[in-house]
Amino acid sequence: MADDKSTNEAAAKPVAEKATATALAKKAPAKAAAADKAAPAAKGETVAAKPAKASAKKDVAAPREQVLKVHHLRPAAGAKKEKTRVGRGEGSKGKTAGRGTKGTKARYQVRPGFQGGQLPFHMRTPKLRGFKNPFRVEYQVVNLEKLAELYPAGGDVTVAALVAKGAVRKNEKVKVLGNGDIAVKLNVAVDKVSGSAEQKIVAAGGSVNR
């Protein structure tokens, strides 16, 4: 029995040694793999640290100014509304196109100036009487009081002299009227003189030449 135990122990020792050797061999690659994983992790930390520095540099840089351009502009929501094309089927008021049935507004449109059938305004207003004479002659008017002011010592009154004194405009007819009094001698030669003005001029010793 003692010999059997010793032989069994001797046979078991090599088996145990082999088992421990295989266990150590399995543990060694696991440790190496863990070390390899730890090394890239450390490298990753260093790599990750570099972008942090880069981002810090970017933060330090001045922000880029945003410029508003024409192509950035857009109409407000709901501002652009498509026009309804009526009369293009039952979905778009296809029968009467929103005009109703019969009548002037259904066929075309009310003419400009139509006032609902009542007498139009241009027919209700009264007409201007008379007419404008196409042969009417317009005169520039000069009264005797103005002549007394312009000619305090008397003299010859002509259209050219009155134009030179600024009393009338040139190239237009002149008429002397009798408003005011005259006490000096005037020789009047203008286009027309009223009856009262002629009497006063002659009474003051002057003359009238037409």
Curated annotation (Swiss-Prot):
<dbReference type="InterPro" id="IPR005749">
    <property type="entry name" value="Ribosomal_uL15_bac-type"/>
</dbReference>
<dbReference type="GO" id="GO:0003735">
    <property type="term" value="F:structural constituent of ribosome"/>
</dbReference>
<dbReference type="Pfam" id="PF00828">
    <property type="entry name" value="Ribosomal_L27A"/>
</dbReference>
<dbReference type="InterPro" id="IPR036227">
    <property type="entry name" value="Ribosomal_uL15/eL18_sf"/>
</dbReference>
<dbReference type="InterPro" id="IPR021131">
    <property type="entry name" value="Ribosomal_uL15/eL18"/>
</dbReference>
<dbReference type="GO" id="GO:0019843">
    <property type="term" value="F:rRNA binding"/>
</dbReference>
<dbReference type="InterPro" id="IPR030878">
    <property type="entry name" value="Ribosomal_uL15"/>
</dbReference>
<comment type="subunit">
    <text>Part of the 50S ribosomal subunit.</text>
</comment>
<keyword id="KW-0687">Ribonucleoprotein</keyword>
<feature type="region of interest" description="Disordered">
    <location>
        <begin position="76"/>
        <end position="104"/>
    </location>
</feature>
<comment type="similarity">
    <text>Belongs to the universal ribosomal protein uL15 family.</text>
</comment>
<dbReference type="InterPro" id="IPR001196">
    <property type="entry name" value="Ribosomal_uL15_CS"/>
</dbReference>
<dbReference type="GO" id="GO:0022625">
    <property type="term" value="C:cytosolic large ribosomal subunit"/>
</dbReference>
<dbReference type="GO" id="GO:0006412">
    <property type="term" value="P:translation"/>
</dbReference>
<feature type="compositionally biased region" description="Low complexity">
    <location>
        <begin position="9"/>
        <end position="54"/>
    </location>
</feature>
<feature type="compositionally biased region" description="Basic and acidic residues">
    <location>
        <begin position="79"/>
        <end position="93"/>
    </location>
</feature>
<comment type="function">
    <text>Binds to the 23S rRNA.</text>
</comment>
<keyword id="KW-0694">RNA-binding</keyword>
<keyword id="KW-0689">Ribosomal protein</keyword>
<protein>
    <recommendedName>
        <fullName>Large ribosomal subunit protein uL15</fullName>
    </recommendedName>
</protein>
<feature type="region of interest" description="Disordered">
    <location>
        <begin position="1"/>
        <end position="64"/>
    </location>
</feature>
<keyword id="KW-0699">rRNA-binding</keyword>
